[in-house]
Curated annotation (Swiss-Prot):
Function: Presumably involved in the processing and regular turnover of intracellular proteins. Catalyzes the removal of unsubstituted N-terminal amino acids from various peptides.
Gene name as annotated: pepA
A GO term for molecular function: manganese ion binding
Protein's UniProt name: Probable cytosol aminopeptidase
Cofactors named for this entry: Mn(2+)
InterPro entries recorded: Leucine_aapep/pepB (IPR011356), Macro_dom-like (IPR043472), Peptidase_M17_C (IPR000819), Peptidase_M17_leu_NH2_pept (IPR023042), Peptidase_M17_N (IPR008283)
Top-level taxon of origin: Bacteria
Chief place of localization: cytoplasm
Entry-linked Pfam families: Peptidase_M17, Peptidase_M17_N
Naturally occurring in which organism (per UniProt): Ralstonia nicotianae (strain ATCC BAA-1114 / GMI1000) (Ralstonia solanacearum)
Length: 506
């Protein structure tokens, strides 16, 4: 999909101007008001009052979530005109803007329109600028246009031939915003590319997306963007004494991998931001076996790994001026005659011992060794990303990512990035009292703390391995993928993480 930006002055958009431009569809937003402005007013003038008549008749009132598709409108070069309701102007928030974009895309999906002029970017949400409107439009349009099977046709012998979808989108902006809009469009495309990589990795079946596949993906990113990559195998992992990580790998024949991918866009002496992604490419639960129903979705248990690789790809494409390192411990969690058993005690890389009370609480075991490993980078901040607990879904559903952090500054920066990118999070507690639930009679700690506050105790477990740097934990179990008819990876939290890094880079 190709995006471009163009400065348009709708006051000068007569029959020989912008309205005369040829396209498959001209998309125009209309507020819930009798007053017309911008592209809507220009259209009304060019069509001798058509828009005003539609409003007066009640055929289109500009209400949120509504649209009206017009064909072969006299005085307009586009084959179609799509009017999109924006609701009340005073209530045109960032969420209302996103709803308008999605409303337009739903209407367009029922047409063969491929080349579109998109004017909604000249109506940014309240308290947002044109750059935000452009970046958000690009990411939402690309997100809606994602088709996994079209990207991986080898997985189906027979496919429906859609033959449709947007191909070219021209985003209109005011002249004063033209330069910022062009940059924003490029950044939106980079974020969309990162999200699509993340979604591809999550959606691939686990017999294809193995730990080795993830390692090769990191190598390809490094090759494409001239980054540094290192992949450690089992012997190197053993030499580092990552006993917790190795305990999870024991039941599988797939070799574990420990991936370190470096983007060096900042000064050499600048402390890096480290992103650590949980990479369980398939999670049976191990000896603490999961129920069979829905187990196929456990291929998504590596979405933390996928999201940090997708984020690093986006950062590299944008060329942000900061240093970022992605670290991915990746393996399968399988039962076998030599798999780790409930009650086994292992020694982590940190030297702390762990009683493995439940082998299905494996994500924290591979992460804790990775969190110890990253101390060597003397990081400015470490953010781990994991589909860690079902309990966070009970707490937050599928809307907000769970955000845990000791530092208010880091937590607030992540929450602000989530709000700005429409990839929202909600801060969860890390009170010291929760640590009591992790006590063990036979080791320094257990790997679970029981059902109460289970997402919190999982984060508290990780906190024990992060004392030497500023740290945050994102539990994406509720936001990384969807079930049911819309089953598939979402690409979250790539927008949140990328915006956080954009804000940090300045």
């Amino acid at each position: 999909m190709e995006f471009s930006t163009k400065a348009l002055d709708w006051a000068k958009a007569g029959p020989s101007g912008a309205l005369a431009a040829k396209s498959d569809c001209l998309v125009i937003g209309l507020f819930e008001s009798q007053t017309l402005a911008g592209a809507a007013k220009a259209l009304d003038v060019a069509t001798k009052g058509l828009v005003g008549r539609l409003v007066k008749l009640g055929d289109f009132e500009g209400k949120r979530g509504t649209s009206l598709l017009l064909h072969e409108v006299a005085g307009v070069g586009a084959a179609r005109v799509l009017l999109v309701g924006l609701g009340k102007e005073a209530e045109f928030t960032d969420r209302a803007y996103a709803e308008a974009v999605r409303t337009a895309l739903r209407a367009l999906s029922g047409t063969k329109a491929a080349n579109v002029t998109w004017t909604l970017t000249q109506q940014p949400a309240r308290d947002k600028d044109a750059a935000w409107a452009v970046l958000t439009a690009v990411t939402l349009i690309r997100e809606a246009g994602y088709r996994f099977i079209e990207r991986h046709p080898e997985l189906k012998s027979k496919r429906d031939k859609s033959g449709g979808g947007l191909r070219k989108v021209m985003l209109t902006v005011d002249a004063a915003d033209a330069k910022a809009a062009a940059v924003a469009a490029a950044r939106g495309a980079a974020i969309a590319n990162g999200m699509e990589l993340t979604r591809d990795l999550g959606n691939l079946p686990s017999n294809i997306c193995t730990p080795t596949y993830l390692a090769n993906t990191a190598r390809q990113i490094a090759k494409d963007f001239k980054l540094k990559v290192e992949v450690l195998g089992r012997k190197q992992i053993e030499a580092l004494k990552m006993g917790a990580f190795l305990a999870v790998t024991k039941g599988s024949q797939e070799p574990p991998q420990f991936i370190v991918l470096r983007y060096e866009g900042g000064p050499a002496k600048q402390a890096p931001v480290v992103l650590v992604g949980k990479g369980i490419t398939f999670d049976t639960g191990g000896i603490s076996l999961k129920p069979g129903e829905g187990m196929d979705e456990m291929k998504f248990d590596m979405c933390g790994a996928a999201s940090v690789l997708g984020t690093l790809r986006a950062v590299a494409e944008m060329g942000l001026k900061l240093n970022v390192i992605a670290v991915v411990p990746t393996c399968e969690n399988m039962p076998s005659g030599i798999a780790t058993k409930p009650g086994d005690v292992v020694t982590s890389m940190s030297g702390q011992t762990i009683e493995i009370l439940n082998t299905d609480a494996e994500g924290r075991l591979i992460l804790c060794d990775a969190l110890t490993y990253v101390e060597r980078f003397r990081p400015a901040a470490v953010i781990d990303v994991a589909t860690l607990t079902g309990a966070v879904i009970i707490a937050l559903g599928h809307i907000n990512t769970g955000v845990y952090a000791r530092s208010d500054a880091l937590a607030n920066a992540l929450l602000a990035a989530g709000k700005q990118s429409l990839d929202t999070g909600w801060r969860m507690p890390l009170d010291e009292e929760y640590q009591e639930l992790l006590k063990s009679n036979f080791a320094d700690m257990g790997n679970i703390g029981g059902r109460p506050a289970a997402s919190v105790t999982a984060a508290c477990f990780l906190a024990r391995f992060t004392e030497k740097y500023d740290w945050a934990h994102l539990d994406i179990a509720g936001t990384a993928w969807k079930s049911g008819a819309a089953k598939g990876a979402t690409g979250r939290p790539v927008p949140l993480l990328t915006r956080f890094l954009m804000d940090r880079a300045g």
